[in-house]
Amino acid sequence: MKNLYLIFFILILIFCTGFSDSVIDVSVSYQPAVERLEQIFKSYMPVKQGIIYTKVPRGLIISIDENEFFSTGDARLKESSLYVLDTISFIVERLKNDCVIESHTRQEIPQDSDYKEFWEISTARAQNIADYMVLCRKVPFEKVFPMGFGELMPFKNNVSTSPKGFD
């Protein structure tokens, strides 16, 4: 059975609001900015089935299927994934937003893999994406934050082991 592994690019919007402003005011002013981010990414990103956009209080999450970036049990980026990363880097580089790269996986790890634990491979994958964005695409390092969670903190409530489930 094949599990999905999602890479999350979370663009955190920082708003300058006074301490006297209510939470409702912040969320109301926040929503148009997230809508705009989503429009920007959708206009530049290639149209693919494995890309899901989700608006959350902390920003826009762009979830991308693991097969876009990695082979099973491996943390090296596939050459075919570089176009998607180049596009994301191009946009992130021009925005004021930070980019958090969250890696989650419950995919079976082959015995001959360099990684034995889910957290090890997910951390290495997030770091490799960040390294590519910073070293190859020149995104400022202070804007990119890689995080590996292994099997912990799955993104979707419908986590399952079926091919259509999300981790």
Segments (PLM) and residue ranges:
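N-terminal targeting leaders that direct proteins to extracytoplasmic destinations
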Residues: 1-58
